[in-house]
A protein has these predicted regions:
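C-terminal membrane-solvent junction of multi-pass transporters and transport-like membrane proteins
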Residues: 169, 340-350, 388-409
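Juxtamembrane helix-boundary/capping and inter-helix hinge elements in multi-pass membrane proteins
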Residues: 56-59, 85-89, 98-104, 240-248, ...
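Select transmembrane alpha-helical segments in multipass membrane proteins
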Residues: 25-37, 62, 101-114, 147-150, ...
């Protein structure tokens, strides 16, 4: 990239934080947005949690999504502000380092690391059975584990080759996910309209309690939004690879949450309106695929499942990218074990190869001990909430002392 005024400004801002430019800056607004959008991956989150929502709170449970969107958008606004003030790779680790104490920053960095290492195999475990079904591979524990391990290996390899290739693939995945979600939403709305679907189903509580007793189940359904609308800060983790990062990243963070929230809400409404028989859906092991295939037919259903596979793969790949940058950011501060190895950037690929290999090894180990992982996978919901809480509390306490940069987001 030509080292013009914007590049020079990015370098000067980074040097103000006592870091030198080592990673190649090539990400622009869409690519930065794509990183955050893929990490959120509404396709992955909704497909994983729709069954829980529909069986816990009935069709009316989908409206908790709107509440979760508002809450996460407020968090995103704070993170966007921090990304504009401190445009350095490492997101919450770097922010809290300057808002609180080094110990709190170190703890936050390690919590973030644990979350990312756990969530990669968890995401790919969601891809495996869908891919196996499309390829007519028998769904067994051994086959699923092999698919997950191969997926993790491929995601790591793409990251080692370089951020440019990974970004190209991710940009394409975001495009296909967006087109797929919009297209499927329209098809489901049309199908529901053609069979004169009753809009009152959107307020049905199904087998759940009604009245004041419904408050508990409804609150539980918010877990879908809480599980899904996380990871938007991933674009901040690639700040040092982003052009004009202090303006680009904040816009990407807010846009990713806002558009994910809007697309997700319309998709949930369309899917719920298209329910052919509520009793059958409530008793189904896979309610959403059942609704899609019974409404649109086998061909369109499988076509969308291909898009689902692409979206989930991109989600895991982006998380791998984000994890590598976190390890790199912590290592150059000597806040990670064997920092002298993990802070190195490959001159050929402009990527933290050693850090990515560490992620690969740890994720393969987690996958091999999958029975233990299932007990830990709940942490992938708790850990980001803890990271957000620590960041927001640290920011609220230090906000009056934060120096805002003129011209920032």
């Amino acid at each position: 990239m030509k080292k013009g005024g914007t590049y020079s400004e990015d370098v000067k801002i980074l040097e103000a934080f006592n870091y030198k430019q080592e990673l190649k800056r090539s990400l622009k607004l869409f690519s930065s947005f794509a990183v955050a959008f893929s990490f959120i991956s509404i396709t992955t989150g909704i497909f994983t949690n729709y069954k829980f929502v529909i069986q816990t709170g009935g069709p009316a449970g989908i409206w908790s999504w709107a509440i979760a969107v508002v809450g996460q958008l407020l968090v995103a606004l704070i993170f966007a502000e921090l990304a504009g003030i401190i445009p350095v790779s490492g997101y919450s680790y770097q922010w809290i380092k300057r808002l609180s104490t080094p110990f709190v920053s170190w703890i936050t960095g390690w919590i973030s690391f644990c979350f990312l290492i756990l969530v990669i195999p968890a995401v790919d475990w969601g891809l495996a059975p869908v891919l196996a079904g499309l390829l007519n591979i028998p769904i067994s524990d051994q086959n699923i584990m092999i698919i997950v391990m191969c997926t993790i290996l491929l995601q790591a390899a793409l990251n080692i080759i370089g951020v440019k290739l990974a970004t190209f693939i991710n940009n394409g995945a975001v495009f296909t996910e967006t087109i797929g979600m919009i297209g499927l939403t329209i098809f489901l709305f049309v199908a529901a309209f053609n069979r004169n679907a009753d809009p009152s189903i959107l307020l049905s509580t199904g087998n759940a309690a009604t009245g004041t007793s419904y408050i508990g189940p409804f609150i539980l359904t918010m877990l879908m939004g809480s599980f899904t609308l996380v990871g938007f800060e991933a674009s901040a983790n690639l700040s040092e690879e982003t052009v004009n990062a202090h303006k680009t990243v904040p816009k990407a963070i807010i846009a990713s949450v806002a558009l994910s929230g809007i697309f997700g809400m319309f998709f949930l409404i369309a899917s719920t309106l298209a329910i052919p028989n509520l009793g059958d859906v409530l008793n189904s092991n896979n309610p959403l695929p059942y609704i899609i295939e019974s409404t649109l037919g086998d061909v369109l259903g499988k076509l969308f499942l291909v898009l689902v596979c692409i979206s989930i793969f991109a989600c895991g790949m982006v998380i791998t990218t984000s994890a590598g940058r976190l390890i790199y950011a912590m290592s150059r501060d000597n806040a990670f074990f064997f920092s002298q190895y993990f802070k190195k950037i490959s001159p050929k690929t402009n990527s933290p190869v050693a850090a990515t290999l560490l992620i690969l090894i740890l994720c393969l180990i987690s996958t091999y001990f999958a029975e233990s992982l299932t007990l830990l996978v709940g942490a992938t919901a708790v850990l980001p909430a803890l990271i957000y809480l620590i960041t927001i509390v640290s920011y609220s306490r230090a906000r009056k002392n934060v120096e805002f940069r003129t011209g920032s987001f």
